[in-house]
Amino acid sequence: MSQPSLLNQLNNIVDKESCGDYLLIDIIGKGGFGVVYKGLHKTKGYFSAIKKIKIMKKKKLQSESQISLMAEINLLKVLSHHNIVRYYEHIPSSSHSYIVMEFIENGSLEKIIKRHGLLPESLVTVYIAQVLNGLEYLHRQGVIHRDIKAANLLISTDGSIKLADFGVATKVSDLSSDNPDDTFAGTPYWMAPEVIQMQGISTACDVWSLGCTIIELLTGTPPYFGLAPAAALYKIVQEDHPPIPPGISAALKDFLLNCFKKDENIRSSAKQLLHHPWVKSVQIRNPETQAPKNARQEILSYNAQLQDIIQDNNSNITRPRSSAVVQPPSPSQLVPPLTNMNISSSNDNNNNNNNSSATNNSPNISSTTTKNNSSTTNNNNNKLTSPSLSSSLLPIPATSTSTVNQNKASPTLNSSWSAVPSNKISQTVNSIDKSSLNKINNGSGQHVQIASPRKLSAGQKQSIQPNIIAAAATTTTTTTTTTTTNAATNTTTTTTPSSTNTGSNVTSPVVSAISTPPPIPTTPLSPMMKSQEQLNQEKEKINLHLRKFSEKESDDEFDNIVLPNSTICLQKLQPILSHKPPIQLQRQQSFNANNNISNSNSNNNNNNNNNNNNNNNNNNNNNNSNNNNSSNNSNNNSNSNSINSSNSHKLKLLKFNKFTEKDNEDDETDLVFDQKVSDTSRFKVRNQKKDWDDEFDNFGSSGDESESSTATTNAAINSNIAKKILPSNRIIRYSSSGQLKQQQQQLLLQQQQQQQQQHLQQPLSPSEMKLKVKETSEEWDTEFEESFDTISWSEADNQRTINIQDKYREQVVKTIVEFILQLKPNQPNDVLIDTCQKLTDLFQTYPDERKLLISNGEGGVYFRLPIITILEILEDNCCCNSDTPSDVITTTYHHNNNSDTFSEDFSNVELVINLLKLLNQSIIKEKDIQETICLMNGISIITKLATKQFDELIREEVSKFVLQLCSYSTYSLNMFITGSRGCKVLVDLLDSDYFNGFTLIHNSLDAISLIFKMNTASPKTALCHLFAKTALMYRISYLLNQIFNSSDKSATSKSQQFQQKQIQQQQQLLLQQQQQQQQQQQLLPSSSSPNLKFPVLSKSSSVKNLSKDQFDKVLAYSVKAADILLFFSTGDSLVKEEMSQSNVIKYIVNVLDEIYTWKTIGNNIRSFLLKILKVIKNLSMDPNVRSRLDDAGVIPPLINYLKKHGGIDKITEIHNQALHSLYYLLLLDRSRQEKALKSSILEPLLTIIEERGPLKELALPILFDLVRSCNNRSLLWKCNTIDKLLDLIEDRNWFADAIESISTWATLESKLVFEKLNSGGTISPLTSTSTSTSTSKSSPSSSSSSSSSSLSTSTSTSSSSLQLPTSSSSTSFENHNIPLRLIGILNINHIKHPSFQKSIIPLFNLINGSQQLLKSLINEGLVNSLVECLRVDSSPVSKITLLKITASIVQSPSLLLVDKEQTNSLYQILNEISKQDESEIVKKIAENLVLELNK
């Protein structure tokens, strides 16, 4: 049975798709340009990645795809780098093209973070350093990748990063000004701004994408990933830089800011970023650059700090006492003793013996040490455990040695755990002695399992073996560890002297402390790299001679240059003191400061070479090496102490001293060469070997020469050192006597003065005036490094703090879990209240741990979901309290306030309040907890407490809960609105006395505002309908009336209620303080400050009696309530109908009336008033609502706000809203117009018209409607309305409506109007009505007298020369002014106006209504105006009306008043019209008029 299955499997493999010699097995990736397969070679059996690209059938697309494909292949062919995926071959076919590349086993970093989670910053540093190496190589080759992201970064099993997917890559050489590559290529979220704007591409766009990739590795998504691609592209271009993720180090933040510079010209390049401290921190974390420390002391110090943290945690937080709770471990249990650390006197003796033998025969000891280490590691391998699972999940390169701890620590470095008290950490650092070790070793017997280094491969052992042999020469009796370094692989192995004994099974903890993962396999060295290795050996050989200038412990701190013979040195220094300071003084200074650190391994290699080349001098060399190593060890110890105590300020001082000049000062501010430099500067020196090439060319001879040739060059070396180190403008301090120092200083001062005089006397040469430019790449590299010198990196200190913070977090989590386990329904109320208060305080201090409420296990303790238990307890107590009214609960509490025990009802109330506080504290900005509460039906349980039968404090906590639901999660908001009748709950919360508990009302208003701002499942119109049915508008209008229109009686009662409420809360505060003192609680609950919740009112609860701060707060929420009303007023007719109920509008009217009575109305009140007036305006626009507004009495307050009010600033805006509302309300409704007249609308209306502002356009239609349809005209006469209408005749825009209103008024009150038009005086309607009979009898005589007076005083004026005045005339008119105004309608400038035809009809009616008026018009030149209009006008309609006016003149007796000249011109124009006009009607009328004139 097994053979057929095997054959079937083989057949399946054979049946796979193939291309050339490869089988396409599995799909490992898909993209926009093709599919990537995992391929298997048919004959050789190795795997490869094969990219399959389909060839387009269309010729145009086929050519474009072929060009891009060949471009990618040509790029891959020429690229050869360790961090770039390797290209094998190209296999074309008829339908597809196949690119065969190197297969990377673990896939991309994108898959890694999706599969295993986010990467810590320490691991990201390792990977990005390799990406930068690959990018630097690409950019050096002139290649732009253009698609750097995590999906295109492949990771192999040894941790190497490979750049892949060169489908959109291009070469810089292909770009030019004539052919720039402005194509929109790449992935949107990783694109640089210049690519999005199509401004041309450069290598800087890859640096931007690299910064986005770092954020992707740290957070899981690139910047702006939550937005749509188009929106993300807009954000990239508009904002200064993408958002920097929180919780990262300062070095990484600076690195990202260098990547995200908008200007690509100033953006850092990949070569520059390789020198950034964040990238260099990969090598700083390598143990080879750290000073050796006492491992035992470090472990004891760390454990003592943990003990102190645990004790501090236990003292601050009182843990519950329950047998069901798992007790926390004791300090002795939490800090177990170390295994294999039995240090006795015999072991010390063995160590000393082994060390002494090591100094005599170094090579043998090194070999045995290696064997013993490997054997010890193998023997104890089964006993040791891995420190973290990250090593099994991710391939970690050898350069990262502290990622194990940082995988846990880095996400919480900047979180709430940074609040761990630093004094508690630092108190026990220096308090460790042997007694503490004995106490730990005599503990409970638990053992700490120390991880050993992973087993090395054979090739790795061979690469490490030569260094182990070389490192054996440095083994001394004063050191406990020896470190060997492989320069090619950066691998560090640590051995102990006690492990050299083959019979000993002791494993040193230092091995595990400094153990590293396996190194990255390196490629064979090229011939150029081999020559570089030889140069490095030569430089290291010269370091032996530089040791003579190192400082001893007994020397002065600033005397770093030690010369064996001072007189000889002076003779050698005198001829060279005139040299200028070297350019790379700072690097040489750092080199000398770290001479002892960097020479330990180089001396060993030098000695081994001498042993192989010269056997005669073997013993001498060994002795010299031992002596040198002993001095080196002492110097290393001193250096390690100084490194631990130094900071970044000394490094900055060394940098700045290079640019200072102090000739006359003789203190410590001169240029010094201090040995005590920080880790950053030492790291910098160890990574500047390439920058030292030009300096080492002058040092020593080649490695093949003998020591005799080296000895002959000592003088040259000393002189070269002096040239490089000693500037001519600095005072050098020697380690000789004081007299010698004074002589040297005087000599140097003389030399400086002579040089300055010579320099001033000699003119500058042209060569000296030229700008000096750096010529070598090493000088530029140094410039890159110095640009990042301000950024410090202290990895060791941060790591210790992070570890202690993690331990502190574990203790807090245990405490929270213990409290959660006590939340049980069967517990007494006092215990539950105390537990809720403690959990609330803990969650407030440590908000990150609130997620424990929705987890069912932590630290091996599995329990029920805590949020379910809390809701059950809350529901049980809600059922108990639902039958007890709030006034009964308050009374019970009031009578028992002096007793030591609570009643059962009040204990339930207090428990409910504390449970709600715990829930409110846990859901702040926590969407997961909110959604979990929604799923557990928690909303309905909690919102039952919103009704008025429960206590105000309970309802206040419910309002806070509702506000949190509406603030952050759309899901919880939808569940609250649609599934739990949220609209009804919010209205219930508003049903409260504002001045007794406005916090819950404020929360409710905030929640309602947020509901309409967030995206909900229901449309906004449906939400408006839901709220309208729940009487929300009534509650808000009643609330506003309660705030602004409180009566004295209600105010007094509310004040008394508030005082009782305040006394109740103070008593509750005292009882809570007593409980806290008994339980030794330091934190006060949120209810401990009642004075901040409610205003203190003395006489009245009106808003006018509040203080300024309280008034501003109340007014702010009043504006928010007005905003809600304004939003509903813009709804459809159904919402407006619900909103226009009489019980809603009447409260709004009361608010308007109350505010109008205030003497001063500030800007804040004015903004509120504007919103309320806008609400009425929006409602008045609906015809179905106007009658309801009228019934509610809206018109009088609106008219009040049209009047002048001295206390309102910028009253024009108020007039605008009120006038709009009146316009819609008074439109075509005579009854409402009558009400408006009775409310004295005319006076403010005429005032607005006289101001000639923009509101005039709204006021005039209202005035015309009042004139045309009003029955109570006595008010019109009282306000001289007709005079205003006569003024409007001269207004070009309103002359037609004005003459029409006058004509309509004349039809209703013809006698009074014509008397006004004929006399020009102001006539009282009452007087005219009482004397109407006498006036009618004497009308002929009066008319004749008026006509005679007009003839005697009038002057003839041509109508063609009449100009319309722009300013309004006086209210009292003379007799001849009114005819002139009426004749002005016939101005030829009005003929083309659209209202001209409309205006001449009422003029014709006025002429026919009064012969006296006609005579006055004829005397003022009516005939001339008619002739001009008939000649110009071409409209038959208006011409017919003009001919009718002409007929009235011809047929009336007033024709005799027309002179002969006017008659002739009239006859002439009528004759022309009768013959030439196009209209037959016009011709006929003109012919009849001609006949009349002929008679």
From Swiss-Prot:
Its EC number is 2.7.11.1. This is Probable serine/threonine-protein kinase DDB_G0278901. Residues 319-403, 476-515, 594-646, 1325-1372 have a biased composition (Low complexity). PROSITE patterns: PROTEIN_KINASE_ATP, PROTEIN_KINASE_DOM, PROTEIN_KINASE_ST. The keyword Signal does not apply. Residues 315-419, 476-519, 593-646, 693-712, 1325-1373 are annotated as: Disordered. Keywords: ATP-binding, Kinase, Magnesium, Metal-binding, Nucleotide-binding, Serine/threonine-protein kinase, Transferase. GO terms for cellular component: cytoplasm. Transmembrane segments: none annotated. It catalyses: L-seryl-[protein] + ATP = O-phospho-L-seryl-[protein] + ADP + H(+); L-threonyl-[protein] + ATP = O-phospho-L-threonyl-[protein] + ADP + H(+). Its cofactor is Mg(2+). It comes from the Eukaryota. The active site is at 147 (proton acceptor). Residues 404-419 have a biased composition (Polar residues). CDD domains: STKc_Cdc7_like (cd06627). Residues 22-279 form the Protein kinase domain. Gene3D superfamilies: Leucine-rich Repeat Variant, Transferase(Phosphotransferase) domain 1. The lineage of its organism: Eukaryota, Amoebozoa, Evosea, Eumycetozoa, Dictyostelia. One of its GO terms (molecular function) is protein serine kinase activity. Belongs to the protein kinase superfamily. Ser/Thr protein kinase family. ATP binds at residues 28-36, 51.
